[in-house]
Design a protein with these regions (language model features):
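Sec-dependent bacterial lipoprotein signal peptides
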Residues: 1-16
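Ser/Thr-rich, low-complexity intrinsically disordered terminal regions
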Residues: 17-142
Length: 142
């Protein structure tokens, strides 16, 4: 009985390791403003609109809304969007000259409730995961 309990516990802990919004990080020798420009331009080319933009801090959030017809009917849901959050992190050690590009992919579902619209995180769609990898691939070698 004890072995079964340990096995069930181990499987439960392993199952909780999955993340809703996967993050991809890559270190590059690129200059931070160039990296920011590349990531923002790539997001726009992928039909995302920048909704939060901090070029000085090296961070932005981009969203792309899509039709709910592809997902099927849900009486409360009236909007779904793919979200890309991009962080450009400068190295503290100036001698190394590395910059980290961090891209997080996610999906938000907006539901109408009695309190008003509520955004709920969903598992990242395959499209937004692919778009995040595209940005990393394009900009890591800039």
């Amino acid at each position: 009985m004890r072995r079964i309990w340990c096995l069930v516990t181990a499987l439960a802990v392993a199952g909780c390791g999955a993340t809703l919004w996967p993050t991809t990080k890559v270190q590059t020798k690129s200059y931070a403003p160039d990296l920011y420009g590349c990531a923002a331009a790539s997001a726009r080319a992928l039909k995302y609109s920048l909704v939060s933009n901090d070029s000085g801090g090296g961070r932005f959030e981009a969203r792309r809304k899509y039709s709910l017809r592809a997902e099927g009917p849900d009486v409360d849901e009236y909007e779904r969007a793919d979200v890309l959050t991009v962080d450009i992190i400068k190295s503290r050690n100036d001698s190394s000259g590395t910059t980290t590009l961090k891209v997080q992919a996610g999906t938000l579902s907006t539901h109408g409730t009695k309190r008003g619209p509520t955004e709920d995180p969903e598992y990242a769609s395959p499209e937004v995961k692919k778009d995040a990898q595209t940005i990393v691939t394009r900009c890591a070698s800039t």
